[in-house]
């Protein structure tokens, strides 16, 4: 449904990220995580066609609806939804109520795959639990950005971590991600330790050969 090949995104002072290959299916429920400034929202904007300043291939074979910076956009945006969204922007609702209203619109059954940026940022606990229930009842998937670990663990079955300009995939919830990440870190540390040992062995061997 969403296919990315050899994607390179740069900003004026550096390469933001490079993604060799990434495929997202329509029923995937994914969290995109990573530290601030790593390019998470930029990646969503590229997928949506809102940012075309990149190298590589991005193909989307399905309708998308999304919420970025509290602004809902969909393929068939009805006058009623637009009117309600404008009311929230005009300040007639609290930030939490405005976001809840927009998320309700976004979660309409007529929409397809969702892309959502920080969906719980202005929600109280009750509103967050309602959102979790709605997301879990959906038959189609979503890709969301969030720093809320509890929310991710309850709604997502796959984690994409944007780190050091690369994407690492974890096929499980947030708890699985934490466990698997620790295993990968230990494996990399062991690999590096073995590399250093082998490097020193070869250096010693070369030194002995020179002496003889």
Question: What do these predicted regions represent?
Answer:
Residues 1-4, 185-212:
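Flexible nucleotide-interacting loop at or near the entrance of a catalytic core
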